[in-house]
């Protein structure tokens, strides 16, 4: 089975081909330099860039892989969650291909795809406990099968990835700042008492990171020289000598986030410990060294198998869309052409048709 994947949920325009569980082609066009000028993603600009880039990227992918539209069995496209305008560009393109070719169309839940792409490298043993950590979402799922996801926890306010990007912005670092924070943090010595582990003094599995951001803002207000260090690093990058305090504060901040994720995942694991066979960590923040280490420690402590996608599969990509689309098609699922886009914050309906 050959599946085309299309991803346009935010600021990455991506297309990929997966055949029988293996990626045979993938192209990604990032808009990060454009949005960096504004300190974050501008939805209207993102939509226009998807519209400009998607067609040429598709043509190049098909040419490089030496396949045609007629060779495809399935067309999978992100239908949500994401920026509505951006989603509509990808959805319209996919529907056009499906209408012209008569191929199977499947709308993909972007969040579920993030978690299942780990299986492209190593099979998932179900049931699995999945942690999705990204700029827009922080969710814990119990995954009983590729088409059975049970949401156990979500963030009540800010996502973990957003908390990283906002901290980077406070320090005067460029967008997207999460990667830079991680790079700086790896050279620091974390202070485990500098920042709180938010929303842990309860029995809940849900997350809340707004208090951590507030704590960081208050700390930087006390020590404005850290902001000056961040701006110096930004202006001259690694060529300028940076004071160790900047490394240490970044390290302490990421330790607070990673330990919070550990605590909540441990609670979920204890609740289902006799059932869970695999821990999966996915999303953009799954590429963070502190998060990866914390989840490795969790898996070791509870003697569970852990799957962490390689870093290029942690951020938004079309490989995960094509891979998940193929899995669903093999189970007989598809969507009609009235498939709708679902923006962030709205429930994605279970409206697939089984044939």
Swiss-Prot record:
GO terms for molecular function: iron ion binding; N(6)-L-threonylcarbamoyladenine synthase activity. InterPro entries: ATPase_NBD, Gcp-like_dom, KAE1/TsaD, TsaD. Its main location: cytoplasm. Its cofactor is Fe(2+). Coiled coil: none annotated. One of its GO terms (cellular component) is cytoplasm. It catalyses: L-threonylcarbamoyladenylate + adenosine(37) in tRNA = N(6)-L-threonylcarbamoyladenosine(37) in tRNA + AMP + H(+). Fe cation binds at residues 110, 114, 316. It is an enzyme of class 2 (transferase). Required for the formation of a threonylcarbamoyl group on adenosine at position 37 (t(6)A37) in tRNAs that read codons beginning with adenine. Is involved in the transfer of the threonylcarbamoyl moiety of threonylcarbamoyl-AMP (TC-AMP) to the N6 group of A37, together with TsaE and TsaB. TsaD likely plays a direct catalytic role in this reaction. This is tRNA N6-adenosine threonylcarbamoyltransferase. It comes from Lawsonia intracellularis (strain PHE/MN1-00).
